[in-house]
Amino acid sequence: MSKNRAEKAEIIEEIGEKLNEYPIIYLTNFEGLTVAQSNDLRGRFREAGVEYQVTKNTLARLALDRIEGKDALEEFFAGPTAIAFSEDPAKPARVLQDFLEEEELGRPELKVAWIEGDMYDDPEALDTLAELKSREELIGEVIGRLLAPAQNLVGGLQGPGQRLSGLLQSLADEEEDE
């Protein structure tokens, strides 16, 4: 069933908003997936908090034309294309990597990952991107490192005090025994 101009304009607008809103965009070739596999993949993306949609290349290119700075993605809208939109660079890569390992299909293929202005279109990029830490993990590490010196200081101050307390207790015990 063909879509009318108004429906197509709405789709172009929706894709354009997402392309503009999300700093992380993955384009994949989903060719060769069964309906069940495709639905499974969509569910995995949804669980990870990643928006995933199949789109017509023509409509996606028209949406790209309206957005500044992401026109380099246009060449990757060829053949069957699905777009994953995310705030976290590692989540889509982890979903794809897990799916590829479990299904052993070699599909979907990563066409390109757009990570805040940088493009990764190397087949090995998926492994590298999947290993990236999330923003929350990085914040946790920074906080841990900032707190470590204070914890070491407290431990250092408590150590001699505890030794002195133990020594005084031993002396007191000896006096009681005498």
UniProtKB/Swiss-Prot annotation:
Subunit description: Part of the ribosomal stalk of the 50S ribosomal subunit. The N-terminus interacts with L11 and the large rRNA to form the base of the stalk. The C-terminus forms an elongated spine to which L12 dimers bind in a sequential fashion forming a multimeric L10(L12)X complex.
Molecular functions per Gene Ontology: large ribosomal subunit rRNA binding; structural constituent of ribosome
Pfam entry (one): Ribosomal_L10
GO cellular component: large ribosomal subunit
Keywords, ordered alphabetically: Ribonucleoprotein, Ribosomal protein, RNA-binding, rRNA-binding
GO BP field: translation
Protein name: Large ribosomal subunit protein uL10
CDD domains attached to this UniProt entry: Ribosomal_L10
Annotated function: Forms part of the ribosomal stalk, playing a central role in the interaction of the ribosome with GTP-bound translation factors.
InterPro entries for the chain: Ribosomal_uL10 (IPR001790), Ribosomal_uL10-like_sf (IPR043141), Ribosomal_uL10_bac (IPR022973), Ribosomal_uL10_bac_type (IPR047865), Ribosomal_uL10_CS_bac (IPR002363)
Source organism: Salinibacter ruber (strain DSM 13855 / M31)
Gene: rplJ
Keyword Ribosomal protein belongs to the record: yes
Entry similarity comment: Belongs to the universal ribosomal protein uL10 family.
